[in-house]
Amino acid sequence: MAEPATDTILVLNGPNLNMLGTREPEKYGHATLADVEALCRETAASFGLKADCRQSNREGELIDFIHEAHARKMKGIIINAGGYSHTSIALHDALLAVQIPTVEVHVTNIHARESFRHHSYTARAAFASLCGFGIEGYRLAIQGLAAKLGLKPKA
């Protein structure tokens, strides 16, 4: 049995997000995945939460992480499914199956990019979706999730 993590949120990053900082910096900026994870841990801690940060380029592994979040009774999910946002009904279904409050994040404004990026399956399984704020979107997502959970910043 998985160890409970009731004071934890899952921060899930999908394909190619391990390349942040080097992949098309004119679109995605110079911050790395390690920078994103540090920002998420810091923001989560300000609400008395822990951030369990995961990244995978494989759809099935992302689904396994979502299922694990349910088994461990995590409080919420922040997801940037990358390109899978636009293609993965399986990720959509996994998010709906676990019924954990979820916020979708995208570093870029997906609605200002190629038309195939305008639709997001994962957004339909989330209570909120943020895009275009760069990595600051992760901070905003955690703040929004905390508000949804009724949590206030710790002094």
Swiss-Prot record:
One of its GO terms (molecular function) is 3-dehydroquinate dehydratase activity. Keywords: Amino-acid biosynthesis, Aromatic amino acid biosynthesis, Lyase. It is an enzyme of class 4 (lyase). Substrate binds at N80, H86, D93, V107, T108, R117. It comes from the Bacteria. PANTHER family: CATABOLIC 3-DEHYDROQUINASE. Catalyzes a trans-dehydration via an enolate intermediate. This is 3-dehydroquinate dehydratase 1. It comes from Bradyrhizobium diazoefficiens (strain JCM 10833 / BCRC 13528 / IAM 13628 / NBRC 14792 / USDA 110).
